[in-house]
Amino acid sequence: MARDFPLERVRNIGIAAHIDAGKTTTTERILFYSGVVHKIGEVHDGAAVTDWMAQERERGITITAAAISTSWQDHRINIIDTPGHVDFTIEVERSMRVLDGVIAVFCAVGGVQPQSETVWRQADRYSVPRMVFVNKMDRTGADFLKVHGQIKDRLKANAVPIQLPIGAEGDLSGIIDLVGNKAYIYKNDLGTDIEEAEIPAEMADEAAEWRATLMETIAETDEALIEKFLETGELSTEELKKGIREGVLKHGLVPMLCGSAFKNKGVQLVLDAVIDYLPAPVDVPPIQGVLPDGKEAVRPSDDKAPFSALAFKVMADPYGKLTFVRMYSGILEKGSYVLNSTKGEKERISRLVVLKADDREEVDALRAGDLGAVLGLKNTTTGDTLCTQDDPIVLETLFIPEPVISVAVEPKTKGDMEKLSKALVSLAEEDPTFRVNTDSETGQTVIAGMGELHLEILVDRMLREFKVEANIGAPQVSYRETIRGSAGGEGKFSRQTGGKGQYGHVVIEMEPGEPGSGFEFVNKIVGGIVPKEYIKPAEQGMRETCESGVIAGYPLIDVRCTLVHGSYHDVDSSEMAFKIAGSMAFKDGVKKCNPVLLEPMMKVEVEVPEDFLGSIIGDLSSRRGQVEGQGVEDGTSKISAKVPLAEMFGYATELRSMTQGRGIFSMEFDNYAEVPRNVAEAIISKNQGN
């Protein structure tokens, strides 16, 4: 079966922004104007197509990245609508990894918000070309050029307006296209009757000024264009389009558009710009990966290249497990067998589907550049590579942040125990930032995630989708342990109880590892003083002790253990004896290496009316917070601070009462930092049951 659209006419794009900028509404309008839906769905009505989970429709926020296919002007556009809430950062992260271009949506009133900066950084991490849509131009206080200034100052982006609004707030009547040097006037509420017109006389000077700025910016990218611009002071529409496209693809330029998705103004022009300026799969660098021999390789976006794809999302579904894939090269056919090269396992492709939110269309094949979903994969999880068995490759995977908050969870009735464990396994498969552990001492099941809302929604899903009622404990901070010094450690396990005894003996050197390295084991045993078969058990003993911690029972991170010496007994030594000896040596070493406790620090942004500034700063300081910046804009004070997560539980309620309900805040994980000695002592003492 041939392709519906040539690769040059495919666009894989994401719609991303902070909460309430209007991402989902923008996506809904795109689907309406491109004919996928025939009725406009509103987020606040709970009718949005891309918000297909019950919780999304109730809360009016997007939680999971819904993937939808549509077409516009003979181009295939695959769209991913991403969540704006920081607790769902993994959803944004995984969509950025598989996209070729992004529409960043900003609110014309709120401008650049803390979460916008997070999303922008994620797009930077994966070098995703982008354009900006300044939405909500119909709202009171809307200011397109103020947002332009904020994007340049805060995001350090070369943002260039290619449109201007005609009117603003309640008087938004149309849009000036600076590239084509004309105006579009909206004649009806649905935004389907649009008149192409001359630029209104009262805006002619402003439009000419911004068009000159646009031409100058484009001319600077090309010597031939500079000469023409200096001679004639003019560039053609085609030259401008070509220059903008090249600037976007090289990450040197971010075109800015404007409108109001809710009032149906400007959305068709956004679709035109997606086709004109955002890349096709063939325009972005080929995906990189590693071959079985360790050499780096690339896979070009081409149906004729060997098949390779990345699983970027796994979802439980009434019909079985859905694995979303981004096709990078080759063709994937229904009924074929492929290799999961990340895990080294064979998988069968039972069915292939293309999604339109919760509607789906079965297809016989997916091709290079496609976004689709596979049914029937047994062992594939987020970030795994699928490829042909004859030409294996492992593609670059996703950046997955560590969870920072945990709660104990137990079923309300004994009979729900099995249902609870099934639900937790299923949810953890879908979401790599959601972890499930069993506390070895208490036997409690502990779930960990990126924030209170994240865990709240997962518990809610257990009830709705898996019919499991659960009791939830109070949120707990996910502390970590580490070492600051270096020392030796020794563990000797010797037991004689009649008959065969037990004997294992290891000596290690311990030192801090690189940040982010976790636990690192180095074997420097020579001459067989510790036989080969006992080295792995010794390492296992160290690794398990590392996971359960030494000073307060929290995982130990960034430590390197080098096995340097030891001894064994011909008869009495066993794998278990060396595992215990490894654990003993590890504990001995940690105690001599100045162990410390680490806690998650959160980047907190608070916005309050000016009158409350002093009390908010005082409150943050009392929470062991460090204020890193503050400013006032239009009577609103903005404070940015770093505060330990342990001090932030219940902050939303506190902030409401301190500001009479007029303060808002956002919070995201920043880094792990050492806990002050007096606080650490209290935590250690509590955990040791003193």
UniProtKB/Swiss-Prot annotation:
The gene is fusA. One of its GO terms (cellular component) is cytoplasm. Catalyzes the GTP-dependent ribosomal translocation step during translation elongation. During this step, the ribosome changes from the pre-translocational (PRE) to the post-translocational (POST) state as the newly formed A-site-bound peptidyl-tRNA and P-site-bound deacylated tRNA move to the P and E sites, respectively. Catalyzes the coordinated movement of the two tRNA molecules, the mRNA and conformational changes in the ribosome. This is Elongation factor G. Pfam families: EFG_C, EFG_III, EFG_IV, GTP_EFTU, GTP_EFTU_D2. The keyword GTP-binding applies. The keyword Zinc-finger does not apply. Its main location: cytoplasm. GTP binds at residues 17-24, 81-85, 135-138. GO terms for biological process: ribosome disassembly. It is found in: Cytoplasm. InterPro entries: EFG_II, EFG_III, EFG_III/V, EFG_IV, EFG_V, EFG_V-like, EFTu-like_2, G_TR_CS. Keywords: Cytoplasm, Elongation factor, GTP-binding, Nucleotide-binding, Protein biosynthesis. Residues 8-282 form the tr-type G domain. Belongs to the TRAFAC class translation factor GTPase superfamily. Classic translation factor GTPase family. EF-G/EF-2 subfamily. One of its GO terms (molecular function) is GTP binding.
